[in-house]
């Protein structure tokens, strides 16, 4: 049985049961809904972040509280859920990009080519009708041959 919250300090008793508790049992976790004992970030004990695996401090919004989003960094302003993946949690992201692979750092530019078969061709200079190869991404080289 987990003790209920007592003001600003909570009891740690019962926190090793491996299940989410109705009442908080860890410090800084006195919220309506508690995190599971596997939560290691106190700020992740917010109700919206009470998932099996907790998010990091910078990634505690409801849509980002999945295991795949719990990375060191996350993009809160990213408009697509696929940008919550580890490879997409970068400084910049392109929400309107049609391909999940375009959420990689090199692809998170103003323009992107969703139909581009080469991930490195998602850079601005390579967003042409026909994509270049990875080693041939100059504007004048985005043709059928490089």
From Swiss-Prot:
InterPro entries registered for this protein in UniProt: KAP
Domain of life of the source: Eukaryota
Residues in the signal sequence: none
Tissue expression summary: Expressed in the hair follicles.
Keywords: Keratin, Repeat
GO cellular component entries: cytosol; keratin filament
Region (18 X 5 AA repeats of C-C-[GRQC]-[SPT]-[VSTL]): 5-145
Repeat region (Sequence), residues: 5-9, 24-28, 29-33, 34-38, 44-48, 54-58, 59-63, 64-68, 69-73, 83-87, 88-92, 102-106, 107-111, 121-125, 126-130, 131-135, 136-140, 141-145
Complexes and interactors: Interacts with hair keratins.
Sequence similarity: Belongs to the KRTAP type 4 family.
Function text: In the hair cortex, hair keratin intermediate filaments are embedded in an interfilamentous matrix, consisting of hair keratin-associated proteins (KRTAP), which are essential for the formation of a rigid and resistant hair shaft through their extensive disulfide bond cross-linking with abundant cysteine residues of hair keratins. The matrix proteins include the high-sulfur and high-glycine-tyrosine keratins.
Name by which UniProt lists this protein: Keratin-associated protein 4-1
Organism (species): Homo sapiens
